[in-house]
């Protein structure tokens, strides 16, 4: 089942001379684990933020992005929070409270979810992510890996169907990064959540990806299985940096 449909998407930042995204068309299926890659400045982050409407940058946009057949522009805050979750690069930037337990409940409280439901969901996520031992800690006492895991758990407590992540391991050490990526795949497998991941540790994520989206200069260069992308990229450009 198609969960995200992107058709002829173009985007240009204010005062920019050319489009950052040009004629992007994609079909993303429910439960897919998709890795988005490409050189710095190719439009990866812009694409992710346009999918999460509250994070969309200012600029000129044309084309459409549909979630379950419905324009993301028509989703209200509650619908968007329960549909699409976002985790960014900096573990500190998404944390908004001073206690771990409050961070987990904050989004649900803002949506007016009943307290008994909040307690149940927070307890389930704390157990699933192994947060119980530091559940009552202050957030500024956590390591970078713990903070990013908390960010992920705080998003998952909203029960989104799509999870988009913009280089979430970029500030983590190799061990914490590997643990984080393994957790993403576990969520994808056990909950059937659709994952769109921008990640520079390609050797860690290609083996677990269903699809790879390779972008170049704001366009889709290739979109297929990891094996097919590698094979076709060798034909298109044997000297491409991704092949080295």
Regions found by a protein language model. Give the residues of each.
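A short, flexible loop at the N-terminus of ABC-type nucleotide-binding domains that lies
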Residues: 1-6, 11-23, 55-58, 76
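Conserved ABC transporter NBD signature motif
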Residues: 60-70
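Conserved ABC ATPase "signature" region
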Residues: 116-134
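Conserved ABC ATPase signature
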Residues: 138-142
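Catalytic Walker B motif of ABC-type/P-loop ATPase nucleotide-binding domains
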Residues: 163-166
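H-loop/switch region of ABC-family ATPase nucleotide-binding domains
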Residues: 199-200
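Conserved beta-strand-loop-alpha-helix hinge in the C-terminal portion
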Residues: 219-243
């Amino acid at each position: 089942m198609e969960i995200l449909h992107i058709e002829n998407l173009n985007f240009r930042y204010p005062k920019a001379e050319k489009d950052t995204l040009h004629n992007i068309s994609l079909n993303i299926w429910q439960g897919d684990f998709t890795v988005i890659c490409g050189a710095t400045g190719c439009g990866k982050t812009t694409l992710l933020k346009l999918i999460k409407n509250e994070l969309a940058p200012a600029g000129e946009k044309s084309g459409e992005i549909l979630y379950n057949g419905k324009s993301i522009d028509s989703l209200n805050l509650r619908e968007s929070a329960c549909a699409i979750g976002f985790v960014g690069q900096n573990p500190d930037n998404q944390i908004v409270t001073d206690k771990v337990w409050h961070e987990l409940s904050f989004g649900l409280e803002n949506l007016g979810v009943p307290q008994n439901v909040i307690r149940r969901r927070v307890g389930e996520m704390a157990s699933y992510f192994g947060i119980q031992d530091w559940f009552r800690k202050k957030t500024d006492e956590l390591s970078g890996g713990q903070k990013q895991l908390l960010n992920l758990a705080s998003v998952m407590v909203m029960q989104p169907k799509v999870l988009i992540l913009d280089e979430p391991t970029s500030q983590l050490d190799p061990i914490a990064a590997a643990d984080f990526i393994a957790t993403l795949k576990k969520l994808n497998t056990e909950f059937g959540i659709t994952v769109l991941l921008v990640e520079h540790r390609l050797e860690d994520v290609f083996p677990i990806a269903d699809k790879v989206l390779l972008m170049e200069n704001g366009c889709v260069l290739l979109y297929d299985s990891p094996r097919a992308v590698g094979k076709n990229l060798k034909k298109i450009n044997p000297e491409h940096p991704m092949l080295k």
